[in-house]
A protein has these predicted regions:
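Short hydrophobic alpha-helices and adjacent helix-cap/hinge residues
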Residues: 1-196
Length: 196
């Protein structure tokens, strides 16, 4: 493949962090019976605009009866985000990515956005594990973050001990699955019996 040729030439390895947009939408539809609207929260930093494009196409092709809205930190403050999400009803699913702002100060990082909107009645789903423990997320479809982190640390350790990065095989997680914070799921009014 082209990447492996470049890896040899430039001495790098690659760890893919896949995002499962279609699986997340399917999971949300299962967990929120009668879901009529999907709101995607993300910043303007790549790849969120690309995810927005993919989600628009997915909704148009497979869920034409569903409304879709992308709320971005590029055009909305945290206060505007809160107001937009606070007005949602139980037929709206919210899928969260990252929420960085242009200033990149610590007070503007995603976890603070999670904490700010955690009290909203609508259930928040996520495309990444971030926010599952303390950020208000009920769940999502994702790879196993702990396995990925172990692999990352192993890869770094191998490089620090002299192994050429290009000799380390590319890594792609293959253990993606639905993950839930069951306490939060119940507190947000979702039925745990609907979990896959």
């Amino acid at each position: 493949t082209h990447m492996s040729e470049l890896a040899e030439e430039f001495n790098f390895t690659y760890m893919h962090t896949p995002i499962y947009l279609e699986e997340n939408v399917q999971l949300m539809c299962r967990m929120i019976p009668g879901m009529k609207k999907l709101i995607f929260l993300g910043d303007g930093i790549y790849p969120n605009p690309e995810y927005d494009k993919q989600l628009r196409e997915l909704i148009k092709d497979k869920y034409p009866q569903m409304d879709y809205e992308y709320i971005s930190s590029r055009t909305n403050s945290l206060h505007q985000l809160y107001n937009a999400v606070r007005k949602t009803d139980k037929t709206t699913g919210i899928l969260v990515s990252t929420w960085f702002t242009e200033s990149f100060t610590s007070s503007n990082f995603l976890i603070n956005a999670y904490r700010s909107i955690a009290s909203i009645s609508a259930p928040l789903f996520t495309i990444r594990y971030a926010g599952m423990d303390d950020g208000g997320m009920v769940g999502g479809y994702m790879y196993n973050d702990q396995i990925f982190t172990r692999q990352l640390l192993k890869t770094i350790d191998e490089i620090l001990h002299g192994k050429k990065a290009s000799d380390i095989p590319f890594y792609e997680p293959n253990e993606a699955h639905p993950a839930f914070n069951y306490t939060r799921l119940v507190n947000k009014g979702l039925d745990p019996d609907l979990c896959p």
